[in-house]
Amino acid sequence: MSLAKTPSIAAQAPVGRFHHSGQVAAYASLSVEGVEVAMRRYLGDGVKRVLVPMWLKSDHVSDQRGNPKASVVWQGTYEAGEASPTWLFSDEARDKGADAMLYSSRSRPELSHVVIFDTACLSYIG
């Protein structure tokens, strides 16, 4: 299955920056520049990628932009057997009924990303 043909599919990894324990999460950036920054660490893995324009429609979006604690490197903490500190923010947003959550890029805080908890809020616009 090509993910480019199903762009609103949730992350397949069992854990991520803002998902764990079977939670749904689809990750995206708000700009092409944000995508380039976010994907830099994955380039060179041989996976072909394409940009897919999407529209997020929701009245319930949590905003953690400007909160550096939501953008910390989480993998080391998780690999040490602890819960990711970033899960506090996504769990709280989910508990309050958010469909998605905005957050700042770790390496370029002026850029924003979004994690979508309910992929039904996404539609393809390309």
Can you name each region flagged by the protein language model?
Residues 20-29:
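A short, exposed loop/beta-hairpin motif centered on an aromatic-Gly-Thr core
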Residues 28-30, 103-104:
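Short His-Asn-centered micro-motif
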Residues 32-44:
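Short active-site loop/helix that positions an aromatic residue
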